[in-house]
Amino acid sequence: MTTNTVTLQTAHIVSLGDIEEAKASIKPFIRRTPLIKSMYLSQNITKGNVYLKLENMQFTGSFKFRGASNKINHLSDEQKAKGIIGASAGNHAQGVALTAKLLGIDATIVMPETAPIAKQNATKGYGAKVILKGKNFNETRLYMEELAKENGMTIVHPYDDKFVMAGQGTIGLEILDDIWNVNTVIVPVGGGGLIAGIATALKSFNPSIHIIGVQAENVHGMAESFYKRALTEHREDSTIADGCDVKVPGEKTYEVVKHLVDEFILVSEEEIEHAMQDLMQRAKIITEGAGALPTAAILSGKIDKKWLEGKNVVALVSGGNVDLTRVSGVIEHGLNIADTSKGVVG
């Protein structure tokens, strides 16, 4: 592969070379996740070939392990000795914690007070020190930055970092290895590290691949920034897609997204829940809200058919770290809707 004129615009931030280097760097740590075809989404919904990239089966249950391990691998011995710190709603936290454990590095993770219990416990289980601070990610991040400065620790940013983006971009290389003629790729978006990395990998190979970012209607800072062509804050309420609850995207990720992503789709909380239910019932996949965003976009009918019908489509299931109480609530809600529908129809 060679970098083309499209990706040259963002090569100073993250390049195909960075991603290929990341692939070699993290190979001993990560799992190459499967890509499976969804017969229901293919035959019943899109009339195309829809594949699910299962990053919920990655170590730590999320794609975040890729970026975290690549970043930490590139730290100096002095930085590793002083310890690392990160701010995360949970998935990045686990990626940092596990990598730190494997490399024998002290790790501190600051999480929002609303972080799911499952993600808190998993992070602690990998040996990291967990501090709960802040009602949203931005408050958490500010506190984390204070601690880092006070203690001389190196920050492992969850998305706005070249090495993190490159690590996430290895997913794009795996997609191309499995489906070289992919037409459309649908990616969940929070701070933008995942879609920036994947878009760089894919567009370096074929600029005509259509890349769609998906965010929740309640929190969509990147989509707002994309269409206003300037960094913009947006958060109306919390979202079941807590892994993407980032109201202000990264400066670096935004620059990549601005040039390489083609469009954004916004989905409601109900549409996200429906997608989680559908993935459980039809594909036997348990996913967190963020991981269901691409499927929600497909099921919602908001994506133009020309990007789906007769096309090879990949929808990324980015993670599966969800509390069982949340899963049971989603199932119960779905059953209640079904019962109500039966009552109306019957």
Swiss-Prot record:
Keywords attached to this entry: Allosteric enzyme, Lyase, Nucleotide-binding, Pyridoxal phosphate
Modified residues (N6-(pyridoxal phosphate)lysine): K64
Cofactor: pyridoxal 5'-phosphate
Catalysis performed (reactions): L-threonine = 2-oxobutanoate + NH4(+)
Pfam families, per database record: PALP
Spans traversing the lipid bilayer: none
Keyword Lyase: yes
Residue numbers binding AMP: F59, T60, Q94, G125, Y126, N321
Tagged with keyword Translocase: no
Regulation: Each protein molecule can bind up to four molecules of AMP, which act as an allosteric activator to the enzyme.
Family from the record: Belongs to the serine/threonine dehydratase family.
Protein name stated in the entry: L-threonine dehydratase catabolic TdcB
